[in-house]
Each structure stands twice: as C-alpha cells, then as structure tokens.
Amino acid sequence: MRSASIILDSKALTHNLNCVIDTVPDTTKVLAMVKADAYGHGIAHCLPALKDADGLGVACFTEAQHIRELGWDKILVLIEGVFSETEWQQSIEAQCQSIIHHQDQVQWALNHLPPENSPCRTVWLKLNTGMNRLGFESDELGDVAQSLVDAGYELILTSHFANADAPNHPSNAKQIDTFTQALQQLREQVDPSIKASLCNSAGILNFKACHFDWVRPGIMLYGSSPVEGVSAQMLKLKPVMSFKASLMAIHNIAAGTSVGYGSRFVANRPIVKGIVSIGYGDGYPRVVDGSAWVSVQLAGEHSSYKCPVIGRVAMDMIAIDLTDVPNPKVGSQVMLWGDPELGAPSVDEIAESAHTLGYELLCRVTQRPLREVL
C-alpha cells in the first residue's frame, strides 16, 4: 500500500490552545478558528481537542452546519457573515452568531430578530481599520450600531490586522488607534456594554494590550508560527500535523545525469537518488526551491538524516539525494514536515522553500494521504 499519510497529534492541538488560554487574561474568551476544515487538519479530528475553547469561528454557514452535526453546542461564529437573507434565517435556526460587515446584512438582521434567549442576539460588527477588505468605515459605524442595539442586539466590535505578523509595521499602531477610538465612541454614545475583538494569532502574541473580550487564534493552534522571523519552537508551539511517506526506489546515478521533469536538476557528482511516494497530488508543494529537504529515518536507528529534495516535484513522486545516508533501504520512513525536535523540517521551513506560508500548505493537503489521529 502507498504509504503517504498525515499524522494528527490531538495533544499538540490542546497544548497550543492552552498556550493561548495562558497568554490572555482570564476575562478574555477564545474563539478558535477552524475554517477551511480546521486549516486542512479535519474538523472532525480536531473538535475533541478544542473542547475548552469558548467558541469556534468558521468562514461560512456550510462549515457551521457540519460542526453542529458533529455535536458542537457552544458559540459558533460566521466570520464572513451570511450571503443572503435566507441564510441569515438559517443561521438563527442553527444558533450561529455572525459578523455583519455591510448594510444588506444589517437589514436582514433587522428584518429577522432572533428569539430573546438566542445566542444569535449577539452580532459581531466589523470595522474597517486598515485591512481594507471588509467592514464599515468609522463615520458610518455609529448609525449601524445604534440601529442594531435599538432592535435588541448585543454587539461585539471586531476588526482584523493587516500586518500583525510584523509587529513594527506602522499600520498596526494606526489600526489599534482607529479601533480603540471607535470602541470608546460606541460605548459612550450607543451602549457601554459593547464588547471587542481585534487579535488574531499574531495579534495575541504581539499586542497583549489589545486582547479585549475575545481573541481569535488560528494558525498558532496548529503549531505554525504567525510571527515573522520567529519559529513555532521559539513560541513553544507544537506541530499538530506531520506529513510522511516512504522510499519507494533507490538508484545510483553518475555525474551529469538529470533527474525529473524538465531535467532541471543535473548531478554534479555521483549520487544516490531516492524516490519518495509523495507529490503535489498529496499536497506537497510543486514549487519548492533548492532549499527544501526531508528527514529520512532508517529502521532501528533513533537519529534521522537530512536529505535535499532534487528535481521537480511531480504529482505522485519526489526525488531526494540519499548520498549521505548510510545503507538506505526501500521502505524507510521519510518525513516531509513535522516536529523539528524529532529531526523533521517544520511546515514553515517547507513553506519558505515554496515561497508561501505554512497556512497554505496545511490547507492544501489533499484527501489522498491516509489520516492517523494520535
């Protein structure tokens, strides 16, 4: 059987959630982001490990429905809001809270007021503070908030950082200032009980004065670093996903021999070449550069060997340089990414080789690899 597989460490997920809980004040609640099938990890596998979160955030109502079917009965927030008036009504039936970021959504909320004891009586009002993607502008926020409060809604003011991963970026201070001023005005002029949520993963770590009432951790829950130039290990985060395969063939090749599509790699010396049963059809990135590497584990040995990826990544296979591995064997385990403390490259390292982010690699893992939950 083809050996490509994903190992999901539920204890690591719980550990990372506890890191968030320990970082924020006791009065701050945690909305764990599980959009895109828990960042590619599989929400059904992750849900038990996230039981101590105060709520979950998803991108859309379809994701929320699935999570309700899995038995989650706590707060569930639609981060993109609803896309129609009908969906607003459906979200009330499913007891989902929603972000409101444009005037049509306001009108749907006014047209269909949830029951008085429904969690949907709380809405998340989105302010555009500088991300310039979604949300109301500061000068229209007051009227929107007043109409919702008058109708019987409780509000959580929310926004999103554009550059929280780079703490010294000048936009961060501007966004924080815009947000705090808007929050103060709403509390003074509309409702003093309005709550607030600003921080994503990077914000939680970099802007501790801005934790407010809710934080929204995402990528840090899954053990990938949200902060530019700081590794997940340095942040005491543990990788939840490990990606592994095995050696399926080994060949000796002479200097001057090319490997793979496009003959991009040409050996400059005699090398031992290994073929690994993994490719972009499994979610390994096709566009890795010459810095990408894997970890090869030989049977009966505790140490592992760092081996460069050579040639182009194909749909089902990659080639690696095994020259420095003593007596490699077909069937030996190959770690594509995982726990650096166990000798594997981190997902962030491979993402850097592919000129992207760990977020994307985790979300792009396909259904072909087998799943194993620890």
Curated annotation (Swiss-Prot):
Give the E.C. number(s): 5.1.1.1
Provide the alphabetized UniProt keywords: Isomerase, Pyridoxal phosphate
| Keyword field contains Kinase | no
Tell me which residues bind substrate: 133, 315
Which InterPro entries does the record match to this protein?
Ala_racemase (IPR000821), Ala_racemase/Decarboxylase_C (IPR009006), Ala_racemase_C (IPR011079), Ala_racemase_N (IPR001608), PLP-binding_barrel (IPR029066)
The Gene Ontology biological process annotation of the record reads: D-alanine biosynthetic process
Kindly indicate where the leader peptide sits in this chain: none
Q: Which reaction does it catalyse?
A: L-alanine = D-alanine
Q: Which leading EC class covers this enzyme?
A: isomerase
Name any one Pfam family assigned in the record: Ala_racemase_N
Q: Name one GO cellular component term.
A: cytosol
Coiled-coil boundaries: none
Known cofactor(s)? pyridoxal 5'-phosphate
Q: Which NCBIfam families match?
A: alr
Name of the protein described by the UniProt record? Alanine racemase
**Organism the protein comes from:** Psychrobacter sp. (strain PRwf-1)
| Gene, per the UniProt record | alr
